[in-house]
Amino acid sequence: MPSVDTASAILRALSALGVTHVLYCPGSRSAPFAYALESGAFGGQARPVLDERSAGFLAVGLARAGALPAVIVTSGTAVAELAPAVLEASHARLPLLAVTADRPGELRGVGASQATDQSRLFATHARACIGLEAQEPSVALAGHVSRAVAAAVGAPTGAPGPVQINVEFRDPLTPAEADARGEEEQPVRATRVSVSAPTLLRWEEAVGEASAGLIIAGEGASTRARLWSQASGFPLLSEPASGAWAGGGVTPYEQSIVAGTLGRDVDTVVVTGRPTLSRPIHALLARPDVRVVVVDQHAPWTDISGNASTVVADLAPPTRPCGAVAAWAARVREACELAGRRIGDLLAAGSGRTMIDLARAVARASDGPLVLGASNPVRAFDLAVPSLEGRAVHSNRGQAGIDGTIATSVGVALGSASSRSADGGGRVTAVMGDLTLCHDASSLALAAATHSDLDIVLADDNGGGIFATLEHGAAASRDAYDRWFGLAQSVDYAALATAYGVSFARADTPEELSSILATSAPGPRMIHAPVERAAHLYGAIRDILR
């Protein structure tokens, strides 16, 4: 089968299997896909992207917004550029198809240009690696593509995640004469594989009676979390990007509540998703006197301390509230109200220009999906924002890296534009620090090229402020901290935005930021919002109920 025919058959199979977006990165070995895309072989949205690393994180953002993306790259280092996004997708359980063009086997290990062993480059981070040899017939090819898509979405029983389809192409890499004449293609029969629904275990069997229970939702939390809370009376505590906020019913200030005196009385915790932000939460889940029930459909489940009493795939809500939990829930509500007042007083006594003040301003002034930098911004929202109810919130906490945050935000904006009802509509607001933005500055080109409905709030604390909230802030001298952890950048952000065709605004106070966010703008916009480092606030808010 000619290479372009092979590429066309793969694209038609991907389209038939529900892949929504194809991101194509230019190259010679991957060129058959370009010709096939130009001929209309893919029925979804196809987009050329210059940078493979940006394309990978653009796919991560699309997956976070509910799309099923595929990234096509050429052979060699182009494949390795996808590695950071593949790691994030793997740990965040996001479906992503990495379609990697390759040279035929006889050209590997003999000194041929741009040839390496790339078929297992992603190792254990890919759910599967499907190898397609050159000239493979389309009937068998469609079956292999079906298996790849099934593995990516976690069907029938696995965890969703990235899958590599490594395609060997022989010359010629251009359309044959028959292809150029538009000869009719044979239909591709793709096999759809359904995801198996887990068995629901009775709440009474898994959790039992409790007098002081909590439900804690981390990234990838079950959509049933709110139902469990309503039916059991257990207060629902949630990280910003767990997905639980979209359904409402969340008790804010989770870190303050758990770290306070009330946290000592907790006897049962139901954990759903992967909570990673809070040391008080981790300490609670490690306590031997607390019964921990983990709800997770897939291995490996989240149990960092090894303290889980029970792990279940899914859980039915209880038929009645649990024990004496009503009085406990009232105590938690009172503690939450007290925490809110004290946090407000604490911030009112400060400068009003910290990352935490900025987070509260963004939460008030915007109403669409949020993308939060995985370092300081997501922690600021977790600590002190009183409500994110009804909001779709995303953060690359799979590996908690700062790489690709702009590209991820563009992906969320594109995916949200395709499904406004699912994500609540509205302009996407991304909040990130200066190092995070600088690390992915080239992805501003993606934002401009896609005309993304996106506000990028640059919370500029003059370097890596996150480390000051950790033990390194006390262990290092000021000069040593700035040299090895801060890494402040001298960047003209207005010029940077202009260079990439992104509009620019500056907000020197949270009030100015709120005003700008309330003003609509076409296309992407960068809002430079300088903030002061205030590491002391993080500990003070965490301990505000002690």
Task: Describe these PLM feature segments.
Residues 46, 88-89, 95-99, 106-119, ...:
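Thiamine diphosphate
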Residues 2-87:
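N-terminal cofactor/phosphate-binding cores enriched in small/glycine residues
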